[in-house]
Amino acid sequence: MIKNHAPYLKAVLFPNNLAEVGSSVNQSNCFTVQDYHYHCFRERDEQGNPYGNIRSGYLEFSIVVSGLDTYQHFYKCMDQNENVPFSFIFNASFSKTGRINDFEDGLITYGYVVDIQESCDNHDNHGQEQLLLHVKMLLSNLIFIGNEQIHLLEITKD
């Protein structure tokens, strides 16, 4: 079984824009997030205060996938070299039918998938082989979503 690197971070990845599909997100279309981090660049003045536009950065994340058909989407995104959305949903609850009920907050990212690495692990409890997929993408947009607010962080290209 793949070790959970972040036992206190309850996050799932939905390979689309959560704001566009709303409550029609099905749990079977989500992936368990093991870890993620992103980095953006911004100029700072002598006092250390940020100013100006945010420059392109990157996002790296690792997810657990089971089966070949579940991770082909990520390779397709890399092959097509298109600006694609991914939604990180934190502390989500799902209904008995598998649809999303509620979530604490989220992060919608847009960018270009530039690298994918795989780590194979033992089988899960159902005898299915699991993969840990490490994805790196160049960011174009970050959108923070929460219970009461949506905040767009626009990234510019230099």
Segments from the language model and where they lie:
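Short conserved beta-strand and strand-loop elements enriched in small hydrophobics
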Residues: 9-13, 84-100
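Intrinsically disordered, low-complexity terminal/linker regions enriched in Pro/Ser/Gly
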Residues: 143-158
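Short amphipathic beta-strand and strand-loop transition segments with alternating hydrophobic
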Residues: 34-50, 114-123
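Oligomerization/assembly interface segments of phage tail-like spikes and tubes
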Residues: 50-71, 113, 128-142
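Family-specific signature for flavin-dependent thymidylate synthase
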Residues: 62-68, 76-80, 89
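Short beta-strand and beta-hairpin "edge-sheet" elements
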Residues: 96-130, 134, 138
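Polar/acidic, low-complexity leader/linker segments enriched in S/T/G and N/D
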Residues: 1-42
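Edge/loop elements at the starts and ends of beta-strands within beta-rich repeat scaffolds
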Residues: 52-54, 79-83, 102-104, 126-128
